[in-house]
Design a protein with these regions (language model features):
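Residues in flexible loops and secondary-structure boundaries
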Residues: 9-11, 120
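Short N-terminal edge-element motif at the start of the domain
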Residues: 20-83
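C-terminal motif of bacterial Sec signal peptides marking the signal peptidase cleavage site
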Residues: 13-16
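Short amphipathic alpha-helical segments
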Residues: 5, 18-20, 199-205
Length: 205
């Protein structure tokens, strides 16, 4: 009878340990998908050696996702007099990793370079180059030669957000008055710009 009691107690202990183990490996459902944007100083670190090859208006930032890999695109939007008026291009599947890549990283570094050049027809055009780590894209845009003053709008601090709404990441604004004002990505700041090329992170549902 005493042996039977020991067997019952042992089974209770074993069952409890199994339950605890199952609970320990259960995925944490409280973790939410998020993306962190970290500004990169092009004058520091590894990117400094690229500086001579970049346009006069350049910037960089890192994007790191936590949770499920998002379906994200980096869109170029043209703004005039405080409102979006057109789309200038887009890079889809921003977190793409080449097939067979050993280190399937959840972080990418985006480098954007903007410059203007004159064509053989003596027309000024804008050249936009975007590197995402897995590839390099180049876009050519018409340019209004009356826009003389130019400036950059960048995030200066690390941001963390959820992939359920568009986020402005970088912009170059220009003015015909030759007066460039400091600004940010708030609605109030964007409403005051004469012209801008705004890079916006968007997510597919």
């Amino acid at each position: 009878l005493r042996l039977r009691h020991y067997i019952i107690i042992f089974l209770f202990v074993l069952t409890g340990c199994s339950a605890d183990s199952a609970e320990a490996i259960k995925p944490d459902q409280s973790i939410t998908d998020s993306i962190t944007l970290t500004p990169v100083d092009l004058a520091q670190g590894e990117t400094a050696k690229l500086r001579p090859f970049l346009g006069t208006m350049s910037g960089a930032f890192k994007l790191r996702y936590e949770g499920e890999k998002p379906s994200a695109s980096l869109d170029m939007d043209i703004w005039e007099n405080g409102v979006k008026v057109d789309s200038a291009g887009s890079i889809g599947d921003l977190f793409f990793s080449p097939e067979g890549q050993v280190n399937n990283s959840n972080e990418i570094e985006v480098i954007i370079s903007i410059d203007t050049v004159r064509t053989e027809e003596d027309k000024e055009v804008g050249i936009v180059k975007i590197s995402t780590g897995s590839g390099l894209a180049t876009f050519t845009l018409p340019w209004n030669s009356e826009l003389k003053g130019r400036g950059l709008i960048q995030n200066t601090e690390t941001l963390t957000f959820t992939p359920d709404h568009p986020v402005h990441t970088f912009a170059m604004h220009a003015t015909s008055s030759n007066q460039v004002f400091a600004g940010g990505f708030s609605e109030e700041s964007l409403s005051k710009i004469e012209w801008a090329l705004v890079f916006t992170l968007r997510f597919d549902e």
